[in-house]
């Protein structure tokens, strides 16, 4: 398997699609929000990106759950392994592509995580704490727990709930075997990354980001559920429900996405410290040069 990872706005999908076309294979998404149907603009889910040379590259684990649903790492592991086994059975090496580091690390390491039930007592104890306080509590549980996507109090409380359950119910990593993968990271300097994020945010607003969120609210999805998803869905929902003005929404969202990208890179650097070999490629290289660099590594790795 080939794994393509990197921060938001670095061009992961473009590289993965080019490689999949070249190798005649399929992609498995590692994005915690692209799984939801109807959440398209805010997650960067442009299905046209998967068209190359007149061919549509199959991408698994996109649009598999309704918006408003709750999805977790336990479910992702099972869904990933179904897609992974299906692709292998058809004689292809899958390409895993995404920016949710916890999903990537869990499937590569073969972590076994249980389906964690709600803990009302713990939730009551955590209610009323700020996101900063909750993030500090979560950090005390160690590196395994995903802090990358925790940008609302609701998500932080759920992450702590999972971490607390695992601490009290330790499980051996036996259900899923580790996966040997060539890991490619797309590296983007900070200034370029920030500019891309800002430019992309302006573009998403022009493409109908606010209308997308309004449509989700009008379909009956509670505002709190959209806030749970964070980033665009959180900030635009706050704007549409009258809790902030447009300018504050935009600047707050822009800052949050910059912070999110920084947390992604922190996670990937942490993966290296935990023993993963990541081959970093300059994200500013032309697409064909990126593809050639990966192909050389892929061939060398057998």
UniProtKB/Swiss-Prot annotation:
Keyword Transferase: yes
Gene this chain is encoded by: miaA1
Function: Catalyzes the transfer of a dimethylallyl group onto the adenine at position 37 in tRNAs that read codons beginning with uridine, leading to the formation of N6-(dimethylallyl)adenosine (i(6)A).
Gene Ontology molecular functions: ATP binding; tRNA dimethylallyltransferase activity
Keywords: ATP-binding, Magnesium, Nucleotide-binding, Transferase, tRNA processing
NCBIfam families to which the protein is assigned, alphabetical: miaA
Family label: Belongs to the IPP transferase family.
Residues the UniProt record annotates as site (Interaction with substrate tRNA): 100
Region of interest called Interaction with substrate tRNA, as start-end residue ranges on this chain: 31-34, 154-158
Protein name: tRNA dimethylallyltransferase 1
Catalysed reactions, as listed in the record: adenosine(37) in tRNA + dimethylallyl diphosphate = N(6)-dimethylallyladenosine(37) in tRNA + diphosphate
Chain sites annotated for binding substrate: 8-13
Pfam families in alphabetical order: IPPT
UniProt binding sites for ATP: 6-13
Entry's Gene Ontology BP terms: tRNA modification
EC nos: 2.5.1.75
Enzyme class: transferase
Cofactor(s), by name: Mg(2+)
Stored InterPro entries: Dimethylallyltransferase (IPR039657), IPT (IPR018022), P-loop_NTPase (IPR027417)
Subunit record text: Monomer.
Species, as recorded: Porphyromonas gingivalis (strain ATCC 33277 / DSM 20709 / CIP 103683 / JCM 12257 / NCTC 11834 / 2561)
Domain of life assignment: Bacteria
